[in-house]
């Protein structure tokens, strides 16, 4: 079954730049898909359209049975609650510990304290940071910070994980660690992963 389906999608910005032209694709549930391309090839635009930060100029985008392109603004938050998003720049809150950064994603959706604690510890364990729960972001390496960002993205058990160049700021060794974490999430949890990158 397709979790993502794009049909004849175009994205042209107001400055006249066409980021995506006539893109059609489908991604099956449980897949791990890479979109590889150079800078300015529309990779990040694709990710942004999937979580509705951007709208297509033309075409249809369906995520989990929802036509994202036609989704009303007030319903976008419901879509995003079903997604996990990992960015290149981690976006951790510097004054919060590893545990608090991951738990924050549960708190904003109104989860109980018990559910928040249980799911947060599980997500931190999955990314291999059980011994760092009380550390702050500035006490972690770049690879560890990205693992915290991944834990935060998966804590609510999303069906789809969108990764926008998650290894872009990391050296090759740390990049391999992050790829291993993502592969484990895909294999063990069955999470569909769409990752955009300029690396082969």
List each language-model region with its residue ranges.
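Conserved ABC ATPase "signature" region
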Residues: 66-67, 103, 107, 114-131
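Catalytic Walker B motif of ABC-type/P-loop ATPase nucleotide-binding domains
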Residues: 161-164
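Helix-to-loop junction immediately C-terminal to a conserved catalytic motif
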Residues: 51
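Short coil-to-helix segment of the ABC ATPase nucleotide-binding domain corresponding to the Q-loop/switch region
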Residues: 96-104
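Conserved ABC transporter NBD signature motif
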Residues: 59-67
């Amino acid at each position: 079954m397709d979790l993502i389906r794009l049909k004849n999608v175009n994205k042209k910005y107001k400055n006249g730049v066409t980021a995506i032209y006539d893109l059609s694709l489908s991604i099956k549930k449980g897949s791990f898909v890479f979109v590889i391309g150079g800078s300015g090839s529309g990779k990040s635009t694709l990710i942004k359209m999937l979580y509705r930060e951007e709208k297509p100029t033309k075409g249809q985008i369906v995520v989990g049975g929802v036509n994202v392109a036609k989704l009303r603004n007030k319903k976008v938050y419901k879509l995003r609650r079903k997604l996990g998003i990992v960015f290149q720049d981690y976006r951790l809150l510097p004054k919060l510990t590893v545990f608090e950064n991951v738990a924050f994603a549960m708190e904003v959706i109104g989860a109980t304290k018990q559910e928040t604690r249980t799911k947060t510890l599980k997500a931190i364990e999955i990314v291999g940071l059980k011994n760092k729960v009380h550390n702050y972001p500035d006490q972690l390496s770049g690879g560890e910070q990205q693992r915290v960002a991944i834990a935060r993205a998966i804590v609510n058990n999303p069906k789809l994980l969108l990764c926008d160049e998650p290894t872009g700021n990391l050296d090759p060794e740390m990049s391999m660690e992050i790829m291993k974490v993502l592969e484990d999430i895909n294999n063990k949890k069955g999470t569909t992963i769409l990752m955009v990158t300029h690396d082969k």
